Regions:
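Bacterial N-terminal signal peptides that target proteins for export
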Residues: 1-9
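Residues at the start of alpha-helices and the adjacent loop-to-helix junctions
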Residues: 8, 18-19, 39, 43
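Hydrophobic h-region of N-terminal signal peptides that target proteins for export
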Residues: 13-21
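Conserved active-site-adjacent core of cysteine acyl-enzyme catalytic domains
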Residues: 26-35, 72-234
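Active-site nucleophile-adjacent alpha helix/oxyanion-hole segment immediately C-terminal to the catalytic cysteine
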Residues: 27-82
């Protein structure tokens, strides 16, 4: 490398280090802002729809497409989950056909919801539906990189041996006083005994170790990350 080139690069390196330091420091912890969306109406199995709505709206999906009763109709291939075809309000008497556990809508219906994503079970033939998929949390570096990039993560947990589970949103992290993550459980606000925050105390902190192992009798299942809204829709 010619001497002048080396000098220029050294100068650029010093400048980059000087300007990048504050950004690095700023992302030692971060909490994303998203609208809390609990399962709508009388649904018992819409945690996937609730977590999906929170993230899709944050990333720019119109509420008319992201609302939970609309997701249920699209994912389950049924009608009557919303009060009217143009409404985002769930039916007062929710039909049983509308209330079944499924993955988030952008996972189940990629042709309808134009988002890209990865899972921690992508190495398996059936991805998140593979029988071998289980206990696959994101490592700390990857998880914090997602939050720093402004992308929440969907994590799933389940009872040991169960084929069904529960989804939550990871919207923040901190290293003080130790590695921990801020999660939003759409089925409840601040659980008793937890350190909570948010306008409704909807987010609660877990140590990263607890996040990996599971909590409240549940074990970690699979994480959905790298969630991005595509620029164009393919029909």
């Amino acid at each position: 490398m010619p001497p002048w080139t080396r000098c220029v690069l050294i100068g650029m390196t010093v400048l980059a280090a000087t300007t990048a330091a504050p950004r690095l420091e700023a992302c030692q912890e971060r909490v994303l802002s998203l609208r809390f969306s609990p399962p709508a109406g009388r649904a018992n199995n819409w945690c996937g729809a609730a977590t999906s709505q929170m993230i899709m709206e944050l990333l720019g999906e119109p509420r008319t497409r992201a609302c939970q009763c609309r997701q249920a109709e699209q994912v389950l291939g049924v009608k009557g989950c919303c009060v009217t075809p143009s409404s985002c309000l769930p039916a007062d008497e929710l039909p049983a056909r509308c209330d079944r556990p499924r993955w988030p809508a952008f996972v189940e219906k990629p042709n309808r919801y134009n988002f890209s994503y990865a899972t921690t079970c992508d190495g398996l033939p059936g991805r998140q539906n593979d029988e071998a998929c289980g206990s696959h949390p994101l490592d700390w570096k990857a998880l914090t990189a997602e939050i720093c990039a402004g992308r929440p993560v969907i994590a799933s947990v389940r009872s040991l041996g169960s084929a069904n589970g529960h989804t939550i949103v990871v919207k923040g992290f901190s290293t003080r006083p130790n590695k921990r993550v801020l999660v939003v459980d759409p089925s409840r606000l601040c659980p008793a005994g937890r350190d909570c925050e948010g306008e409704l105390d909807e987010g609660f902190w877990l140590s990263y170790d607890e996040y990996v192992a599971g909590w409240d009798g549940m074990v970690h299942w699979v994480d959905f990350y790298g969630i991005k809204r595509k620029q164009t829709r393919e029909n």
